[in-house]
């Protein structure tokens, strides 16, 4: 099994393999995007630079601190929890493979090639997966998708026509909450005013209020 994983990774270092395709998906003739069922795409995640994502160690510590009980639970919590479990297990297997390669592959050049590929290409994909699902659990999926779209628009806009700073994910939920509150309060402020002007007596107020409720 370890030899199969080794051949799998080495075969994926071929420059003809598109970066947007998962390695197993390419081998079986399938174009698999792990973000599609969540409303995003690999291309949408690719707008974020590689140094944007924290290290795998930091992301694993965050997932453990926030969602360890749910991740270790035998029950199904959400699709994001399930995806997090799979990503964490996948990274553990990759670390086992890297250790095996370091101990058993005699050719230093081949060993460095495999280890570098795991740390850069595969490591980046794991960092993206972990960040996406942790962020969706923390801020909400719609907020994360809105952020990805906003960042994609910002990064593709020429510097002369865009704000100097990129959008920040943690500020989007505050803006969204304010918008929802304003929308919810506006009808409440407008509806009482005409009733007070039109009803000169308390009896009319009661009758009109009953009619409005019906």
From Swiss-Prot:
Q: Where is this region: 3 X 8 AA repeats of S-P-R-R-R-R-S-[PQ]?
A: 186-208
Q: Where is this protein localized, as stated in its record?
A: Secreted; Host nucleus
Q: Which GO terms describe its molecular function?
A: DNA binding; RNA binding; structural molecule activity
Ranges for region Disordered? 165-214
> What Gene Ontology terms describe where this protein resides (cellular component)?
extracellular region; host cell; host cell cytoplasm; host cell nucleus; T=4 icosahedral viral capsid
Q: Which positions are cleaved off as the propeptide during maturation?
A: 186-214
Per UniProt, which keywords does this protein have? Answer: Disulfide bond, Host nucleus, Host-virus interaction, Repeat, Secreted, Signal, Viral immunoevasion
The site annotation (Cleavage) covers 185-186
The keyword Secreted appears for this protein: yes
Q: Which N-terminal residues, if any, form the signal peptide?
A: 1-19
Matching InterPro entries: Hepatitis_B_virus_capsid_N, Hepatitis_core, Viral_capsid_core_dom_sf_HBV
* Maturation and modification: Phosphorylated.
Pinpoint the residue ranges of every sequence repeat in the record: 186-192, 193-200, 201-208
Q: Which GO terms describe its biological process?
A: microtubule-dependent intracellular transport of viral material towards nucleus; symbiont entry into host cell; viral penetration into host nucleus
For bias type Basic residues, the affected ranges are 178-207
In residue numbers, the region (HBEAG) covers 25-27
Sorted alphabetically, which Pfam families does this protein's record hold?
A: Hep_core_N, Hepatitis_core
What does the UniProt function comment say about this protein?
A: May regulate immune response to the intracellular capsid in acting as a T-cell tolerogen, by having an immunoregulatory effect which prevents destruction of infected cells by cytotoxic T-cells. This immune regulation may predispose to chronicity during perinatal infections and prevent severe liver injury during adult infections.
Its family remark reads:
Belongs to the orthohepadnavirus precore antigen family.
Q: How does it assemble?
A: Homodimerizes.
Identification of the protein by name: External core antigen
Q: Which species is the source of this protein?
A: Hepatitis B virus genotype A2 subtype adw2 (strain Rutter 1979)
Gene coding for it: C
């Amino acid at each position: 099994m370890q030899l199969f994983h080794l051949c799998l990774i080495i075969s994926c270092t071929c420059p003809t393999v598109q970066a947007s395709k998962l390695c197993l998906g390419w081998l079986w003739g399938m174009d698999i995007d792990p973000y599609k069922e969540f409303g995003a795409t690999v291309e949408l995640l690719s707008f974020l630079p590689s140094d944007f994502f924290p290290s795998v160690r930091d992301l694993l510590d965050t997932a453990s601190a926030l969602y360890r009980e749910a991740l270790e639970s035998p029950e199904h919590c959400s699709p994001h929890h399930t995806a997090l479990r799979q990503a964490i297990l996948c990274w553990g297997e990759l670390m086992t493979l890297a250790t095996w390669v370091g101990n058993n592959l005699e050719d230093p050049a081949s060993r460095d090639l495999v280890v570098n590929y795991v740390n850069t290409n595969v490591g980046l994909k794991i960092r993206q997966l972990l960040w996406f699902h942790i962020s969706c659990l923390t801020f909400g999926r719609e907020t994360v998708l809105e952020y990805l779209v906003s960042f994609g628009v910002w990064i593709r806009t020429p510097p002369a026509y865009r704000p100097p700073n990129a959008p920040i994910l943690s500020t989007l939920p505050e803006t969204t909450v304010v918008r929802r509150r304003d929308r919810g309060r506006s009808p409440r402020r407008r509806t009482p005013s005409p009733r007070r002007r039109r009803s000169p007596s308390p009896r009319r107020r009661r009758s009109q209020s009953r009619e409005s409720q019906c």
